Amino acid sequence: MNFLDESFWLAVSFVIFLYLVYRPAKKAILNSLDAKILEVQEKVLQAEKLKEDAALLFKHTNAQIKKLETLRSQMIEDSNEVTKKIIQEKTKEIEEFLEHKKSDAIQLMQNQKSTASKELQDEFCDEVIKLVSEYFQSVKLSESNIAKNLMDKSDFPQDEGKAT
Protein backbone atom coordinates (compact mmCIF):
# COMPACT_ATOMS: atom_id res chain seq x y z
CA MET A 1 0.00 0.00 0.00
CA ASN A 2 1.50 3.09 -1.09
CA PHE A 3 0.44 6.33 0.46
CA LEU A 4 1.32 8.31 -2.53
CA ASP A 5 -0.87 6.34 -4.80
CA GLU A 6 -3.68 8.37 -6.27
CA SER A 7 -6.34 5.74 -5.71
CA PHE A 8 -5.52 5.80 -2.05
CA TRP A 9 -5.91 9.56 -1.91
CA LEU A 10 -9.01 9.32 -3.99
CA ALA A 11 -10.52 6.91 -1.47
CA VAL A 12 -9.47 9.11 1.46
CA SER A 13 -10.87 12.15 -0.29
CA PHE A 14 -14.11 10.31 -0.95
CA VAL A 15 -14.44 9.31 2.72
CA ILE A 16 -13.73 12.88 3.84
CA PHE A 17 -16.20 14.15 1.29
CA LEU A 18 -18.84 11.75 2.57
CA TYR A 19 -18.14 12.76 6.15
CA LEU A 20 -18.39 16.47 5.31
CA VAL A 21 -21.58 15.96 3.29
CA TYR A 22 -23.13 13.61 5.83
CA ARG A 23 -22.41 15.84 8.83
CA PRO A 24 -24.74 18.75 7.88
CA ALA A 25 -27.15 16.43 6.09
CA LYS A 26 -27.28 14.23 9.18
CA LYS A 27 -29.09 16.96 11.10
CA ALA A 28 -31.49 17.58 8.22
CA ILE A 29 -32.14 13.84 7.79
CA LEU A 30 -32.60 13.33 11.53
CA ASN A 31 -34.85 16.37 11.76
CA SER A 32 -36.86 15.11 8.80
CA LEU A 33 -37.09 11.62 10.31
CA ASP A 34 -38.04 13.08 13.70
CA ALA A 35 -40.73 15.19 12.02
CA LYS A 36 -42.07 12.12 10.19
CA ILE A 37 -42.00 10.11 13.43
CA LEU A 38 -43.87 12.88 15.25
CA GLU A 39 -46.34 13.14 12.39
CA VAL A 40 -46.95 9.38 12.42
CA GLN A 41 -47.28 9.39 16.22
CA GLU A 42 -49.72 12.28 15.98
CA LYS A 43 -51.76 10.44 13.37
CA VAL A 44 -51.74 7.30 15.54
CA LEU A 45 -52.94 9.35 18.53
CA GLN A 46 -55.63 10.93 16.37
CA ALA A 47 -56.68 7.50 15.13
CA GLU A 48 -56.83 6.19 18.70
CA LYS A 49 -58.83 9.24 19.76
CA LEU A 50 -61.19 8.73 16.82
CA LYS A 51 -61.48 5.06 17.75
CA GLU A 52 -62.32 5.98 21.36
CA ASP A 53 -64.79 8.62 20.17
CA ALA A 54 -66.39 6.11 17.81
CA ALA A 55 -66.65 3.54 20.61
CA LEU A 56 -68.17 6.15 22.92
CA LEU A 57 -70.56 7.28 20.20
CA PHE A 58 -71.46 3.64 19.52
CA LYS A 59 -72.18 3.09 23.23
CA HIS A 60 -74.19 6.29 23.42
CA THR A 61 -76.14 5.40 20.28
CA ASN A 62 -76.88 1.90 21.59
CA ALA A 63 -78.07 3.39 24.89
CA GLN A 64 -80.34 5.78 23.00
CA ILE A 65 -81.65 2.93 20.85
CA LYS A 66 -82.45 0.91 23.98
CA LYS A 67 -84.19 3.92 25.54
CA LEU A 68 -86.17 4.51 22.35
CA GLU A 69 -87.13 0.84 22.13
CA THR A 70 -88.28 0.95 25.75
CA LEU A 71 -90.20 4.15 25.06
CA ARG A 72 -91.71 2.64 21.90
CA SER A 73 -92.84 -0.50 23.71
CA GLN A 74 -94.22 1.63 26.57
CA MET A 75 -96.10 3.81 24.09
CA ILE A 76 -97.51 0.73 22.36
CA GLU A 77 -98.57 -0.70 25.72
CA ASP A 78 -100.15 2.61 26.76
CA SER A 79 -101.96 2.95 23.44
CA ASN A 80 -103.25 -0.62 23.77
CA GLU A 81 -104.54 0.17 27.27
CA VAL A 82 -106.17 3.39 26.07
CA THR A 83 -107.70 1.53 23.13
CA LYS A 84 -109.09 -1.15 25.45
CA LYS A 85 -110.52 1.52 27.77
CA ILE A 86 -112.11 3.36 24.85
CA ILE A 87 -113.57 0.10 23.53
CA GLN A 88 -114.94 -0.73 26.99
CA GLU A 89 -116.41 2.76 27.39
CA LYS A 90 -117.98 2.74 23.94
CA THR A 91 -119.30 -0.80 24.47
CA LYS A 92 -120.82 0.31 27.77
CA GLU A 93 -122.31 3.40 26.12
CA ILE A 94 -123.78 1.26 23.33
CA GLU A 95 -125.20 -1.22 25.86
CA GLU A 96 -126.71 1.63 27.88
CA PHE A 97 -128.09 3.18 24.71
CA LEU A 98 -129.59 -0.14 23.61
CA GLU A 99 -131.01 -0.76 27.09
CA HIS A 100 -132.50 2.74 27.09
CA LYS A 101 -133.98 2.17 23.63
CA LYS A 102 -135.31 -1.21 24.74
CA SER A 103 -136.96 0.28 27.83
CA ASP A 104 -138.34 3.13 25.72
CA ALA A 105 -139.75 0.62 23.22
CA ILE A 106 -141.27 -1.46 26.03
CA GLN A 107 -142.74 1.67 27.60
CA LEU A 108 -144.11 2.78 24.23
CA MET A 109 -145.65 -0.65 23.65
CA GLN A 110 -147.20 -0.61 27.14
CA ASN A 111 -148.55 2.89 26.53
CA GLN A 112 -149.98 1.83 23.18
CA LYS A 113 -151.41 -1.32 24.77
CA SER A 114 -152.98 0.73 27.56
CA THR A 115 -154.32 3.25 25.07
CA ALA A 116 -155.71 0.51 22.82
CA SER A 117 -157.21 -1.31 25.82
CA LYS A 118 -158.77 1.92 27.06
CA GLU A 119 -160.14 2.67 23.59
CA LEU A 120 -161.55 -0.86 23.32
CA GLN A 121 -163.11 -0.55 26.78
CA ASP A 122 -164.59 2.81 25.86
CA GLU A 123 -165.91 1.45 22.56
CA PHE A 124 -167.25 -1.64 24.32
CA CYS A 125 -168.94 0.45 27.01
CA ASP A 126 -170.38 2.79 24.39
CA GLU A 127 -171.60 -0.19 22.37
CA VAL A 128 -173.12 -1.84 25.47
CA ILE A 129 -174.82 1.41 26.47
CA LYS A 130 -176.09 1.83 22.94
CA LEU A 131 -177.38 -1.75 22.79
CA VAL A 132 -178.99 -1.50 26.23
CA SER A 133 -180.52 1.81 25.27
CA GLU A 134 -181.88 0.32 22.03
CA TYR A 135 -183.17 -2.67 23.92
CA PHE A 136 -185.02 -0.54 26.41
CA GLN A 137 -186.42 1.60 23.68
CA SER A 138 -187.62 -1.45 21.83
CA VAL A 139 -189.32 -2.77 24.93
CA LYS A 140 -190.64 0.72 25.51
CA LEU A 141 -190.09 0.75 29.14
CA SER A 142 -190.23 3.94 30.98
CA GLU A 143 -187.52 5.19 33.26
CA SER A 144 -189.38 4.15 36.31
CA ASN A 145 -189.87 0.66 34.96
CA ILE A 146 -186.15 0.52 34.16
CA ALA A 147 -185.31 1.53 37.70
CA LYS A 148 -187.82 -0.90 39.11
CA ASN A 149 -186.49 -3.73 36.95
CA LEU A 150 -182.95 -2.92 37.94
CA MET A 151 -183.91 -2.90 41.60
CA ASP A 152 -185.71 -6.17 41.25
CA LYS A 153 -182.78 -7.73 39.46
CA SER A 154 -180.38 -6.55 42.13
CA ASP A 155 -182.62 -8.14 44.80
CA PHE A 156 -182.96 -11.35 42.89
CA PRO A 157 -179.37 -12.52 43.22
CA GLN A 158 -179.54 -11.93 46.98
CA ASP A 159 -182.69 -14.03 47.27
CA GLU A 160 -181.00 -16.67 45.22
CA GLY A 161 -178.15 -16.73 47.70
CA LYS A 162 -180.63 -17.16 50.58
CA ALA A 163 -182.43 -19.96 48.79
CA THR A 164 -179.40 -22.10 48.42
From Swiss-Prot:
GO terms for molecular function: proton-transporting ATP synthase activity, rotational mechanism. Keywords: ATP synthesis, Cell inner membrane, Cell membrane, CF(0), Hydrogen ion transport, Ion transport, Membrane, Transmembrane, Transmembrane helix, Transport. It is a single-pass membrane protein. It is found in: Cell inner membrane. Pfam families: ATP-synt_B. GO terms for cellular component: plasma membrane; proton-transporting ATP synthase complex. The chain crosses the membrane at residues 7-25. InterPro entries: ATP_synth_b/b'su_bac/chlpt. F(1)F(0) ATP synthase produces ATP from ADP in the presence of a proton or sodium gradient. F-type ATPases consist of two structural domains, F(1) containing the extramembraneous catalytic core and F(0) containing the membrane proton channel, linked together by a central stalk and a peripheral stalk. During catalysis, ATP synthesis in the catalytic domain of F(1) is coupled via a rotary mechanism of the central stalk subunits to proton translocation. Belongs to the ATPase B chain family. F-type ATPases have 2 components, F(1) - the catalytic core - and F(0) - the membrane proton channel. F(1) has five subunits: alpha(3), beta(3), gamma(1), delta(1), epsilon(1). F(0) has three main subunits: a(1), b(2) and c(10-14). The alpha and beta chains form an alternating ring which encloses part of the gamma chain. F(1) is attached to F(0) by a central stalk formed by the gamma and epsilon chains, while a peripheral stalk is formed by the delta and b chains. This is ATP synthase subunit b. The gene is atpF.
